[in-house]
Amino acid sequence: MTQVTVKQLADEVKTPVERLLQQMREAGLPHTAAEEHVSDSEKQSLLTHLKSSHKAKVEEPRKITLQRKTTSTLRVAGSKSISVEVRKKKVFVQRSPEEIEAERQRELEERRAVENAARQKAEEEAKRRAEEEARRQPAPVAEPVAAQAAAPAPAPVVEPVQEAPVATAAPAADARKKDEQRRPDKTRNDDNRRGGDGERKNAPHRASVKEKAPAPRVAPRTTDEESDGFRRGGRGKAKLKKRNAHGFQSPTGPVVRDVQIGETITVGELAQQMSVKAAEVIKFMFKLGTPATINQVLDQETAQLVAEELGHKVTLVSDTALEDSLAESLKFEGEAVARAPVVTVMGHVDHGKTSLLDYIRRAKVAAGEAGGITQHIGAYHVETERGMVTFLDTPGHAAFTAMRARGAKATDIVILVVAADDGVMPQTVEAVQHAQAAGVPLVVAVNKIDKPGADLDRIRSELSVHGVTSEDWGGDTPFVPVSAKMGTGVDDLLEAVLLQAEVLELKATPSAPGRGVVVESRLDKGRGPVATVLVQDGTLRQGDMVLVGSNYGRVRAMLDENGKPIKEAGPSIPVEILGLDGTPDAGDEMSVVADEKKAREVALFRQGKFREVKLARAHAGKLENIFESMGQEEKKTLNIVLKSDVRGSLEALQGALNGLGNDEVQVRVVGGGVGGITESDANLALASNAVLFGFNVRADAGARKIVEQEGLDMRYYNVIYDIIEDVKKALTGMLGSDVRENILGVAEVRDVFRSPKFGAIAGCMVIEGVVHRNRPIRVLREDIVIFEGELESLRRFKDDASEVRAGMECGIGVKSYNDVKVGDKIEVFEKVQVARSL
């Protein structure tokens, strides 16, 4: 045993001697001087005191881990047995006797306090109940009740507190204490309910206590605890589960929801956001005077009124928020450079637009168009001696108004082609209006200048009426005489176009992501949806993720106007792209996006918005026309299933066909699409009693088989005039015919004779036309019809005559009419059926 002095110990622990002596005195050691010796046991006592003063544990509790292993055999069918081994692990922590004793004393005090409070509460309750019984019952009966109530309640039997084993876990004791605090009157209820023989007593007392403090609607506590104890092998000493974890608590007040309302919302969606049934919303709207259905689309103001009246908080959401966030993410950064102009060729039909463009391209394009008429937009990029120019060729027919308007929006300069021998026509004026509305400069090309009768001044004069003034007359529009056939003036036309482009200072950023507009789209049988896109800014590359209107996809391949594959396309370059999930509408904007998820979200959002707008428009149309259609005969409808080669032609045809008809007949395009006529199209035509029209497309084998079997009417066209004329003829046939009366002749009665066979015979002079025998007549007296019948007898000089002309006399016998007088007029007429027209 080594001993050190107090001074040496102070140097060792680096503490002043005076402080160490003070701590030793506090620990109960007899040391008072620095030279006194300190033994190992005294050091241990000092250390124990210091640890206890710093609230540190004297000794780490020792842990005892017990593992139990139980093996059993489970017999199954087939004389087989399965050996099941159950392993259980339990950890015991040794605690100090002082802590155990303190814990036991604390629990005992808490239990006594709870029992005293419960006893006092029970006595008060019994006394109160006895007083109520005394008030309700007569006086003789009140005495025994009062005596019984005055009897002291039996004292609760306090179970002897068993001494907790040394290996009891501290968390289990804490959980048991909290559980007893949660259930303060369990012991009292058990003692009051059971007597010495275990019989239940004081049932009215329990009922009154239960009525005073109703329990919340939760699952019984014993269920969780007992099942948990069963799973743990019957030992319920582990931490008990939390009570009331999933209990249903009814709301104390009305629940206010945050309802987000866009520009449109259906009744069902509004009810779902407010967490009410759709029937309640419909009932409330009915009270407001607005009948509705569960799928009816409400506008923002109506939905806001309904939600606020029902007590909810409304947040108005812009439907374009998703698209706005996408637009903000598209950044066009980089150096802007000059780009080639996009030139649209417009004009009246057959004025030579495609021939002029054909001469510039030095390729025969007009021969490929049916009838020499442009059916859809063609986009071509041309390298000239003066630079690159991109041309858009638009149709000149009246049905393609929307396509010309789109061409004007996507262009920089418009070449207005006017035939010198034909002058300004309706589509010429329309092209001028489109260009002026889009703010695009015009260059007038007076074509067919080589023909005799060409008058350039007449063209200038007619266009000046519509706000297009020639430079020669002091205006700002160049007029260039050209001949697409001979090539005269084409160089001057290109010079004027490029001069206008220099004035516009057209710029683009090739390093930015591609952005453009859809010129045309179609469905190719072997390649799927194909879209012709004019890149307006940035660069479009193969493999880019693009968003086009309500469609999206990755560019799998790009082709130029000659059908050759290319890897990228810069500004003002028209290309065909493959890889979209559908055929976009002509005029849709195309943009390159980096995130496929974002593109899909915006595309689906636009599709849903289109459906909602379409549904709302259809419902509004029903409500508006419901009273107009009452009392009217149902319109005759010509149903048509229309398939076209490209999207632009389909839209133009649908617009032209829907414009036909009148109050009695109408055209309804029940189905339309891009691509060939398929079996499903034939089935649709069969179900809707429709006519199949194919514009520049053909039917497949399955569709032809159905058409032959069912006798459907299917027609192919390649010129839009033929479709419109045939539909007009069909509608005219559906109109039926009108009955028209033609007055053949008029005879004036000069005298009246009597005949035993015919009665009164009128001696007449034919003053107008020809009087025919066996024709219907009218008898007019002072120009008022008094009889309508049939001419029975017509004679001249006692001879029967088939007809009598003007200026001759004759005798007329009217069938079943004898009241003919001198001065009457007999009008002979015939009824003719005349075909009606639109």
UniProtKB/Swiss-Prot annotation:
GO cellular component terms, semicolon-separated: cytosol
Region (G4): 447-450
Residue segments, region G5: 483-485
Region (G1), start-end ranges: 347-354
UniProt biased composition (Low complexity): 137-173
Chain segments carrying region G2: 372-376
Region span, Disordered: 30-60, 94-254
Residue span(s) of domain tr-type G: 338-507
Biased composition regions of type Basic and acidic residues, renumbered to the chain: 33-43, 96-136, 174-214, 222-231
Residue ranges, annotated region (G3): 393-396
Key words, A-Z: Cytoplasm, GTP-binding, Initiation factor, Nucleotide-binding, Protein biosynthesis
UniProt GO molecular function: GTP binding; GTPase activity; translation initiation factor activity
Biased composition (Basic residues): 232-245
Entry keyword Ribonucleoprotein: no
Binding site for GTP: 347-354, 393-397, 447-450
Localization terms from the record: Cytoplasm
PANTHER family attached to this UniProt entry: TR-TYPE G DOMAIN-CONTAINING PROTEIN, TRANSLATION INITIATION FACTOR IF-2-RELATED
HAMAP family: IF_2_B (MF_00100_B)
Annotated function: One of the essential components for the initiation of protein synthesis. Protects formylmethionyl-tRNA from spontaneous hydrolysis and promotes its binding to the 30S ribosomal subunits. Also involved in the hydrolysis of GTP during the formation of the 70S ribosomal complex.
Family: Belongs to the TRAFAC class translation factor GTPase superfamily. Classic translation factor GTPase family. IF-2 subfamily.
Protein name as catalogued: Translation initiation factor IF-2
Lineage, highest ranks first: Bacteria, Pseudomonadati, Pseudomonadota, Gammaproteobacteria, Pseudomonadales
